[in-house]
Structure formats: structure tokens, C-alpha cells
């Protein structure tokens, strides 16, 4: 089956399983946090060849405008959560995460990966056929899951496979607003032919966003409720902007383009 390229569709994956009738088993153990910064950096530095992933040949993995749009949208969403968050950290762009996202997007595999990184990273995926005006058309469906989410735990919108693989999904949203997931890197790749659950999509636009430290730990809330910035980590020095613990201009996304 080959989809008409004029038809615009967005399909999403989460690290737990897919919403509605199409599901995906969780490829990671989300009950054992492995979000140590050093461990994450070590995993990201592992040669991509060892995971049978083609090396990215482009210097940039996403356009500057798309990168800024994705990053700003995440921070807007994070700063406006309800109930308000006391420890929500400002999200910054991470070049290593972007490189790892590009390496995976280049495989055109409609699944999470590579497996050796999923212990350390959160990951949201989106694929689309047809033209689109803004990259946010591939990102906003993740946020739209908020309508099915009730703080603090994604109860009814968190299907558990294989016993209960149906119902709405909200773990894309909770990854977006996981307080300690303060770094993101994304990549876009156009796949000439991409197998999406048995259907071949021509010129599929594949978006991969990687997050660190990863979120969606079972039994944990995405953030602490309270007065915004009242429980920021000491490393932020009390800096706060738009309800987010702010690290300062030297670490924002502009660093990537110096």
C-alpha cells in the first residue's frame, strides 16, 4: 500500500506504547532511572557505527528556524503547565542529542532507537506525508495529549502493554514537561520510502526529538507542584524566567550557532 503524498497525516509513537489500536511495546526499563549526566554523555559519544547506524553527513541536522520553533514551543508549554511547577527547568538545545536524532532519523525506521541510547534518553517521534507550513505541525500533537492527562500520573492515558494496549496516550506530553529533562536535540529527515506499520509512505518527513535526562519514569510525577521556581536546583542560582528555572544566556540555543 502506497499513501497519496497529497494526504497529510501525522502518526506518533511513545516509549510505552501507541495510542488507540496500534501499539508498541516499551523498549526500555522505565522503572530504573539512568539519567546520570556522565553516563548520558558517554552513551552519546559511542561511535554510531557500532550500532549499525549510518553516520550523518550534514553539518546541521535541522534548520535554525525549525530548531528555534521547537525549542521555544517546548519552553512555552513547560512554563504554562497546570497545576504550576515549582521545579520546571528551562530547556536548552543540545548538539549531541541533535546528532543522535539525525543518525536515527536517517535510518527511516519507524520505531524507537537505537536501543543502546534509550536507557539514557527520552524520545518523541512524528512522521508526516505531504506539505506542511510549520515544523510545529509535527510537534503540537504531542502537546495535544494534555487533554487526556490528569496530574500527577498518566493513569487512564497510559496503556500498559501487552495486557492493556488501547486508549488515549499522553506520554509524549509528559516527556515534554518533565521538569528535569532540560536538554533537547531534534532532527528532520525526508525518507523516500518509509514503512509505517505495513504501509509504504513516499517522501515521509520524519521528526526525531531526543531528551536528556529522560523522563516518564513509572510512578513519578513529571514535576513538583508549587510556586514557580520555588524549588529550582541550586545550580540555577535563583534565576527564573517565564516560570522556568533559567540557566543564563551562555547556555541557550544560540550557543549551537556560534
Curated annotation (Swiss-Prot):
Q: Which GO terms describe its cellular component?
A: extracellular region
Main location as per UniProt: secreted
PTMs? Answer: N-glycosylated.
Subcellular localization, as worded in the UniProt entry = Secreted
Question: Which parts form a coiled-coil structure per UniProt?
Answer: none
Q: Which residues form the propeptide?
A: 22-60
The record ties this protein, via CDD domains, to:
CAP_PI15 (cd18814)
Query: Where is it made, tissue-wise?
Result: Weakly expressed. Expressed at low level in prostate, mammary gland, salivary gland and thyroid gland.
Output one GO MF annotation.
Answer: peptidase inhibitor activity
Residues forming the SCP domain are 71-211
Q: Where is the signal peptide?
A: 1-21
Which keywords are on file for this protein? Developmental protein, Glycoprotein, Protease inhibitor, Secreted, Signal
Q: What does this protein do?
A: Serine protease inhibitor which displays weak inhibitory activity against trypsin. May play a role in facial patterning during embryonic development.
Q: What is this protein called?
A: Peptidase inhibitor 15
Origin species: Mus musculus (Mouse)
The uppermost taxa in this organism's lineage are: Eukaryota, Metazoa, Chordata, Craniata, Vertebrata
Q: Which gene encodes it?
A: Pi15
